[in-house]
Amino acid sequence: MSGLILNILVIGDVGNVFKTISKYVKNSKIHIINFPKDGAGIYTYDENYELFENYKVSDQVKKINQIKENFDLAVVMGTGERIAYLADLNYVSYYVGRDIDAPRFIKNSKESWYNEPLHRLNFFERRFYKKTFDFAIAHIAPTWVFEHLKKFSGNNIKMDLKPIDLTLFNDNSELHLKKNEKFTFFCPQRMGIPKGTDILWKALQFCKSDFQILQVDWRDTGTDEENSTSLRLRENLPSQVKLIPMIKRKDIPGYYHSCDAVIGNLRIGSFEYVELEAIMCKKPVISFTDKKIKICVDGKEMESPFIPNTNDPKDIAEVIDNFVVSDQFRQNIFKKEYNFVQNISDPKKAGEWWDSLFEKMIKENSSINRKSSGITVKLRMLSFLISNRLYFRKIKNYSRSA
């Protein structure tokens, strides 16, 4: 397969992961089709995606069937998995969080920090989503997410490299905003329990130094519990917190450059893209590290330098104050963080890894088409429609047009 360009179809790109990877693979050409922009997606999506025209699953499957012959392999994220299953593709599933720590195929699945289930699906729906999971030819997840993936059997692969788009996040940006007069932390992630906003608010009660936090006015709104808890956080802002409007992805580097430091996730115990982007923009980061979460690159275990190693509010407050009052403290932490991120976010190395994976998967699966029988594929769609309690008329209309 040497010398050939592999054509990869990505269905659903959560967090612009594969948009970044597409810039650094050499032996593969990645085409992404994403779900319609709405809500926060208007700001967080890259602006150069092909989009499905609507959220109707049958239309999305029809679209994929029209273009699939142009590709060698599919990669899916989130609900892209069900589209690939219904289109009978050979696909690799990549997970980034609640798509596997609270999977749809588990009854009343919920994340550990919530009491309310994320999904309340009936038996037939759960069975359908278990089939979409099992149908994948490989499952891939990074860092803390892999700890959840490995609970389920399958061709599970741990991949901790998280490449950063260096064309956007670097120290040469011309998007520098006016420098703030007061020491300023930037917090671009959503307000909510999963990001540790509740922990941060408690920590701020113990802080003694003078600073401000620019928090993006963006919060969790999924379940009733998510919505109510994030709303309480928004309505009870500590005095140090100032809300700023949502920011488009292309404009975020300017905010990194104008702040003094960045506050990342304080709950999950592992870094996300916010932490890595900030470091590549040469800003020190505060983020909780759980030492029990293992990180491996090139077969070697690495230790995350992000601090603190506890998410006790008083310990976080102490780190915040040290960041504010001591330039030497910040620089010492930043040097360790920067050296680590240079390895964990090396886009060239990540591009090589994905090129190698794509080649391996395509050698083992000669076509993007799974080549199931026509009746089997049709029954999958009917099963999906029935499990979602759709009307008989919709089922009959699909049968006539299929």
Task: State the predicted function of each range.
Residues 266-267:
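Aromatic "clamp/platform" in nucleotide-sugar-dependent glycosyltransferases that forms part
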Residues 325-367, 371-377:
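A charged, aromatic-enriched C-terminal amphipathic alpha-helix characteristic of glycosyltransferases
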Residues 163-182, 254:
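Acidic anion/phosphate-binding donor-loop and adjacent secondary structure
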